[in-house]
Amino acid sequence: SIFVSYLTSYDGVKIIARKDRNINEPVDLKQKMIGIVPGTISQILLDSFLSYNKIFIKELKLKHYKGSELPNALVNGEVDAISIWEPYAYFAQKRLRDLALKIPTYRVYRTSINMAVMNDFAAKNPILLQKVIKALIKAVDFMKNEKSQAQNLIAEILDIDINLVEEFWKDVKFTIGLDQLLIITMENEIRWAIEHGIVSSPVIPNYLDFINYEILEQVKPEAVTLIREAK
């Protein structure tokens, strides 16, 4: 079960296009070749984006890649735009420089980073998981209050470009919680997976059954804003 979320983003997955392919706004993607990673958040974001902008998927041309292949595909001109998560969106923009256009996605899809454990482990170790949450709260406070130091530490530990870390920081919200949008997002994702034949069962689970909110309630009750039965 998920017992805490500590990062959310409406910009963790991006649509990056080439300006030299006459793409300036969403409608310009019609009849263009778009690179995606099928069956992933790359495709989910694109579908959500198209629906928001009233563009039919049949009006595009899709080409499938692995995530790590998409920056090269865009830079080499194999595709006109890509839908991809970080850090690959950053890599594509960095290499294309002024030719890169990040198309606004209008907050149509939120990603989150969550922590989850097996139910039996949670039942046997509630105090340990409360300590994990307390450590996460301290870490989030540190990242908010000592941003520069935190960014440099992450760049050093992960051995990555500090500019990548700084760009990532702009796109995310560090926050401890469990909110209703987490469940709504998972429900939308399973509906999408059913529609695309990725899962065989047509049943949408009750995702509240997969969230152990009691642990976070013991540590930071105001951070739990899920809709649930009153006790």
Language model segments and positions:
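Conserved C-terminal helix/tail region of periplasmic/extracytoplasmic solute-binding proteins
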Residues: 194-231
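Well-formed, non-transmembrane alpha-helical positions, independent of function
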Residues: 28, 72-73, 91, 168, ...
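Secondary-structure end/capping motifs
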Residues: 124-202
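Pocket-lining segment of extracytoplasmic ligand-binding domains
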Residues: 21, 63, 68-157
